[in-house]
Amino acid sequence: MTNKTNTFFNIVVCGVGGQGTVLSSKLLTECALRGGAFVRCAETIGMAMRGGSVLGHVRILGQRDLEQGDGVTVPFSSESDSAVSSLGENGTVTPSLCSKSDSAVSSLGENGTVTPSLCSTECQSPLVPVGKAQLLIGFEPVETLRAYRFCSTGALVVTATDPLMPPAAAVQGLKYNGKAQLAALELEAAEGRIGRLELVNNSDVMDKLGFDKALNVVLLGAALGILAESNSPYASLLSYEAMQGVIETSVKPQFVEFNLKALELGYQLQT
């Protein structure tokens, strides 16, 4: 069945070192890739091993045409797309223009199919531009608020509610409960700048799971549930069933079972 997408979807995942931010972005990337999408991803780790901020960027740029084998459906085809001007000796195609849409092709396969490359000004980087993310998943309140700058108007924000005290703040004896950060996000939602704000209570979730790990996967499940509930065009790419398969093959065997339980719990929060 042919499944095509003409727009791209930007996701930012945020947390602190040790919360599974990088793993979460990789699971989302693998899930979209298996669904036939072109995906770019990157992480900015910083001082992760010292409890520092970690960001994962996932950019779903389009979908392969699954009926055409190795062929592709290049996202965006309009008058503003870059035009192909010449074919080199090695089979590379040189685009004459680089526009704001994603349409340039870089190579021609033996069977006549093309492989896309992105030469646009908007999507040449795997990092999500500020103000362009449609989905933000945060594992810690202050990190969610810090990463909120990446969100577009009307974005979906899924965040954990329980704070994780930064080591430097703990050493100084500072107090931090996350309430001010959550209140700021709720104000953004009330004023319409956040399309939907979903607060996931860490303590309640962990009590139901029976263990205090895999919060990241719980929030992934919650985000997938909201996409499915809202009939998002990306729900088929980032489906619950697809993510189950990714976890089964991408997570260490001893951790598969409780990650699947965490995914199910998060998904059921929204469906």
Which residues make up each language-model segment?
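Active-site cofactor/cluster-binding pocket
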Residues: 2-71, 120-271
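Long, intrinsically disordered low-complexity tandem-repeat segments
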Residues: 75-120
